[in-house]
Amino acid sequence: MIYFRNCLLFLFLANSIVSFGQSQSIVLDWTGTERVLLGEEPFDVQTVKGFGLDNGQPFFAIQQKHSSIDQEVEIVNTLYEKIPKEQQLIYQQLGLVPADNAQIDAKIVSEGGLPIFSCYILPLRSVNGSLERLISLDYRFLAKNNQQTKDYAASSVLGSTSGKWYRIAVNKDGIYKIDKAFLEDCGINTTNLNPAHIHVYGNGEGVIPEWNGASITDDIAQNAIVVIGEADGTFDANDFILFYGWGAHRWELSGGNQYNQVRHPYSDQSYYYIYVGSDIAPLRIAQAAVIDAPADTLVSTYEYRDVYENDLENLVKGGQRWYGEEFDVNLSQNFNFTIPNVSPVPVRFQVSYASNSRTAGNQISLKNGTELIGQMVLPHSGSYYQRGTLLCADSTPSSSQSLNITINRLNPSVVTYLDRILINAQRELILTGSQLNFRVSKWSSTSNLASYQLGSVNANAFVWDVSDRHNPVRIPLTLQGNQATFKALAQYRELVVASGVSFFTPEKVGSITFQNLHQLPLADYLIVSHPDFFTEANRLADLHRANGLTVHVVQPQAIYNEFSSGMQDPGAIRRFVKMFYDRALLNDPAAKPKY
């Protein structure tokens, strides 16, 4: 098949500073090429000159010094051209399916305290079944609303002393049930407990992005829930709460309606909070209005995604990248997947790995059963370990996928490690098990209103639209036998159908004490200390206070509670510190932290 080189080259214009009000242009020169293999046959893929392929797609990237961090980028005047027919055929053979528009990520970032204009482009797009490529665009800079982008809660909800807080954990996306026994196991007294006083908080946003300007929820958000049996004002034995919990690992949609999992490198669990108190208004899941208009699109399948990944080996003994199975003594290994009710549409596999192959001739091959579906030469640039990605498809899918990965090596010193296997497929909308998450991202340009058809449902089944992760909405169903239909606008949305019979159960973590880091005043010195060293950290703080400095001493878990919804994440500590910087810059720049 093809070796996708996983290198990323940035063009950095060190002496060029672009200022507010100026309009600039980017022109993409499509005279570059990169040689790839389909089986044993080489092909030259056209790329942007000076750049190659990133995860199988042509790309362009640029960085420039900029005049101000407090600006945002507007892209205008994008110009495309049709890709030559012979190149379109190569892209099709590679299984490349671009999005409807080029993906342009343009922003102002801070590097070493200096503002940098950064732009990364995946320049291909699909138009009515034909491929086009971006050849130029203009960009300009606009003033950014600092108050909006640097807004922090004045006080954390965890500072509410009118009730009690309890932390719980979830392992995957889905609908979770909290019953009376679970509440009591958490230490909550359910005698005379009014269900209107039970609230669920949590963000479910996965790992905090490394980019400082990324938009994420500040503090922790209240989640809409369902409380069965709350009408009588007491929490009885048969009463229970339903909420939608998001796991630690998130999925994102990439080009060609394919999904990629963004793995949380520090946690396999996501955390939520139960708050019991009368000072907060209850937030309940609302029901959407019935849509009477006729649908123009029928939906009976959805986009299925799965991933296989084991964290067993860290090749550089540091960093976030871990690998799984080793291909050395055992050069041929099988991986089995089950895709119930798979549609007769090619199943796409993306196999990522690392190998220390230093010479040509070593190969990785992929079989589904006995059929060879992908093959490529291992990367051999001479570096210690190099990453590679094999992208292929099985055109005759079945519910049972038996994937065989084999390394054919000429030298016994060549060792390969599997990173992960990503699967993208189409499944029939048939409920298997207690609940099913589903979504559709690819729509016809003529689609406006969709009618979804669900199979194998019962009279207790229901559907939630969870596109707003904190405020799910219940969608009315029309039931007929074991079939159900509902209507929704033809646009990307995350949905879940549940049998109404059984649900996932969260894991108890424990109660937490009141805290309010958001309410801390500005300080000269910030100390983050593990509990084991907290006494000594406070001694150090007292020493600096005696010298006239204002000091805060904080434990990491307290920061995680307010800045990463309870998950261990170094990005939360960065955001905690950044809160003091941002508040000072808006009010008194001289008051920003110094240590």
Annotate each PLM feature:
Residues 564-565:
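Outer-membrane beta-barrel proteins
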Residues 22-550, 556-559, 569-593:
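Extracellular pro-sequences of secreted precursors
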Residues 1-25:
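Bacterial Sec-dependent N-terminal signal peptides
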